[in-house]
C-alpha cells in the first residue's frame, strides 16, 4: 500500500507506541524522517535513534522516553500542521510558539529541519511540519 504522507505516518507510529508505553518503534527511514527524529531527540522527546536493515528496507528505530515511576510519555501530543493538500508556511515573525514555548514546532527551512526556537535564532521561516508537546 502506498503511503502518501510519510510524515503523518511517522508521527502516528510514534504517538501510538507512546500511548501503549512501548520501549521503541520502527519508522521507514528517509532524509526527512531522520531530520525530524534528530530534532525530537535534541528537544528531549526521544532517547535514542538507530537504524536497522539496508537499502530500501532501512528503518529508524526510535527509543521513546518516559518520565516518573508511572512511565508517563514525554510526548503528550503530536499534531501534523502542513499537509500535502494544504501547505502552511510562516516567516520568522509568524513562527508559532507551542503552548507558550513549552512545546516545539518542527519547521522545514532552507537551512534544514529544525525547531521553532532554532529557526527564530537563525532568522529563517519555512514550512511548519508539526507541533509536539
Curated annotation (Swiss-Prot):
Gene3D superfamilies: 3.30.1370.30, 3.30.1490.10. The keyword Metal-binding does not apply. One of its GO terms (biological process) is translation. It holds the Pfam family Ribosomal_S8. PROSITE patterns: RIBOSOMAL_S8. Keywords: Ribonucleoprotein, Ribosomal protein, RNA-binding, rRNA-binding. GO terms for cellular component: ribonucleoprotein complex; ribosome. GO terms for molecular function: rRNA binding; structural constituent of ribosome. One of the primary rRNA binding proteins, it binds directly to 16S rRNA central domain where it helps coordinate assembly of the platform of the 30S subunit. Part of the 30S ribosomal subunit. Contacts proteins S5 and S12. Belongs to the universal ribosomal protein uS8 family. This is Small ribosomal subunit protein uS8. It comes from Synechococcus sp. (strain WH7803).
